[in-house]
From Swiss-Prot:
It holds the Pfam family S4. The lineage of its organism: Bacteria, Thermotogati, Thermotogota, Thermotogae, Thermotogales. PANTHER family: 30S 40S RIBOSOMAL PROTEIN (PTHR11831), SMALL RIBOSOMAL SUBUNIT PROTEIN US4M (PTHR11831:SF4). Coiled coil: none annotated. This is Small ribosomal subunit protein uS4. Residues 98-166 form the S4 RNA-binding domain. Keywords: Ribonucleoprotein, Ribosomal protein, RNA-binding, rRNA-binding. One of the primary rRNA binding proteins, it binds directly to 16S rRNA where it nucleates assembly of the body of the 30S subunit. With S5 and S12 plays an important role in translational accuracy. It comes from the Bacteria. Gene3D superfamilies: Ribosomal Protein S4 Delta 41, Chain A, domain 1, RNA-binding S4 domain. GO terms for cellular component: small ribosomal subunit. CDD domains: S4. GO terms for biological process: ribosomal small subunit biogenesis; translation.
Length: 209
């Protein structure tokens, strides 16, 4: 399955909620969802009532789109979360939040996760002093992520830092913008991830059918 490369604003409209996929633009009056808060297409303004399956499917699609993950990989995360001891929902969110592209975004070195994935792919980051160019690389507590010295003048990174400098970072991450680095302190607790607009239990139920 190919990665979606179309207009990401259509994804927000499809899910009926802001997914903040374009970063800075999502906070302005240019946001496509604010201007047209209905599904794309000829019949987009006529939303039908969803079945229980439809609700679960939409929840799953929403989480995938927020984190920019394809179906097979997301399914593997769910399987891994189910096999681990403890709350499956928390296990899943910890796997998603530990991805390198997500952590780069959370630290504020990218405007959105899509941009973070591209920057990681192009080798602009070090993890514990070593170059890692795999967006799905899973970080462990106390891992240090750093912008490579030769990448610190890249305009999109500088712009992201400027945009995020005054914004609060999440409690499981520590950031030092002046030195272009941050630390993944620990895995987050489920209740700490407050910007996920769906109930993960609904997602788990979709894969438990």
């Amino acid at each position: 399955m190919a990665r979606y490369t179309g207009p990401v604003c259509r994804l927000c409209r499809r899910e009926g909620m802001k997914l903040y996929l374009k970063g800075e633009r999502c906070y302005t009056d240019k946001c496509a969802f604010d201007r047209r808060p209905y599904a794309p297409g000829q019949h987009g303004q006529r939303r039908s009532k969803l079945t229980q399956y439809g609700i679960q499917l939409r929840a799953k699609q929403t989480v995938k789109r927020i984190y920019g993950i394809l179906e097979r990989q997301f399914e593997r995360y769910v399987e891994k979360a189910m096999k681990r001891a403890g709350d499956t929902r928390e296990n899943l969110i910890q796997l998603l939040e530990a991805r390198l592209d997500n952590v780069v975004y959370r630290m504020g070195f990218a405007i959105n996760r899509r941009q973070a994935r591209q920057l990681v792919n192009h080798g602009h980051f070090l993890v514990n002093g070593k170059k890692v160019d795999i967006p799905s690389y899973l970080l462990r507590p106390n891992d240090v992520v750093e912008v490579r010295e030769k990448s610190r003048d890249i305009e999109v990174i500088k712009k992201a830092i400027e945009f995020n400098r005054e914004r609060n970072t999440v409690p499981w991450i520590e950031v030092d913008f002046d030195n272009y680095k941050g630390t993944f302190l620990r895995y987050p607790r489920l209740e700490e991830v407050t910007d996920l607009p769906v109930d993960l239990q609904t997602v788990i139920e979709f894969y438990s059918r």
